[in-house]
Amino acid sequence: MSQRNRTLQETTTIHTPAEVLRAAIDFFARQTGIYAAFPEQESTTHVTLRGQGGEEVVIAAIPGAGETRVTGSTYLFDQQVARFFATLAPVPLAVATEAGE
């Protein structure tokens, strides 16, 4: 995977933006040692988390038709962002297919 693909990741979920952002804050606070990150800035559509050595993690959640589009951006915490995304309930295939038509 190229560095660009690791620094900006995207997924969709059935959770609301508020649920996604709350889950991100909880997820990154539970990480151990150098992979913990804590809220620095928040809005209704994003949260910026700051970790060890000043590493920044930005999670954005934008509502859509029956889904929430979630993006994550970071330079060093790419594996943790991917793990967080794996905890989010995916959009059922039928909903995803109908939205694309």
Where are the predicted features?
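Beta-strand/loop substructures that line and gate deep hydrophobic ligand-binding cavities in soluble
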Residues: L49-E101
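Residue-level marker for the onset of beta-strands and adjacent loop->beta junctions
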Residues: T7, T45, E55-V57
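Short, solvent-exposed secondary-structure boundary motifs
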Residues: F27-R30, H46-G53
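Short Gly/Thr-rich strand-loop-strand
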Residues: I34-T48
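Short glycine-aromatic motifs
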Residues: G33, P39, L93-T97
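Terminal, regulation- and interaction-focused segments at domain boundaries
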Residues: M1-A37
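A generic structural signal for short, solvent-exposed coil/turn residues
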Residues: S2-Q3, P39-Q41, G51, I62
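Hydrophobic residues positioned within well-ordered beta-strands of beta-sheet architectures
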Residues: T7-Q9, V47, V70
